[in-house]
């Protein structure tokens, strides 16, 4: 594990896939210019459709398609590791997976995570209703993979509310957590920062949380406040709203010192009832 500059990208994606890819490319280039070697895109970075079924029409087969080509080409050209937010990958029964693909600095796909927990809720205090399960097939497996920067875990948006997933990831040796997200304005204001900081500090890891942020053509408003959090739960950098990036340095010495001084993961007593 080496000291590394990382970046979280924040966007307000639209139904226009081409325009979204141009904007994502611009922001990734900005991150690269600031020295970022690891960049995380938000959930639905390539498409925020007018209706949920729009993602079915834009779905790709793993290994081919314009979104995947963009991610691979950008990672290789800028020589950085890229966590590709989410994109719709074809699944069974006419549905898609909400998939995050990870590309190394040579443009090779080195990891895949399919969103496990689907957002089927009525947002309290609003008329907003979401039923991701109508178009998305849930994933089944957590992901933690080796990178030059440490062990990288990936989770997506609503997953943040299920701490057992992250503890499973920590048990395999997670150093950095990437969380592509699209939190609503209402749920974000209530819970976003609390959840991101909690997942980082309770698992003693860095968290790179990239959120959609702003008003969307489909009428939706997302919360923004993309952030990078250290293993003590401190927000190192954040962006309240609008398109942009946040950058911060992941320091393995800082990680080691926090874990050595506060070895909470070693103090678990799961046999107690």
For each predicted feature, which ranges?
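Short, acidic/polar
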Residues: 19-28, 161-167
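Cys-nucleophile CN-hydrolase/nitrilase-fold catalytic domain and related Cys-dependent amidase chemistry
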Residues: 17, 25-106, 112, 183-205
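CN hydrolase (nitrilase-like) catalytic-core segments centered on the catalytic cysteine
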Residues: 62-83, 151, 157-246
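Short polar catalytic/cofactor-binding loops
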Residues: 10-16
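Extreme N-terminal starter segment of soluble prokaryotic enzymes
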Residues: 1-7
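Active-site catalytic loop in hydrolytic enzyme cores
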Residues: 60, 91-172, 185-187, 191-194, ...
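A short C-terminal boundary segment appended to hydrolase-like catalytic domains
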Residues: 253-273
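Short beta-strand scaffold segments in enzyme catalytic cores
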Residues: 84-86, 99-102, 143-145, 226-228, ...
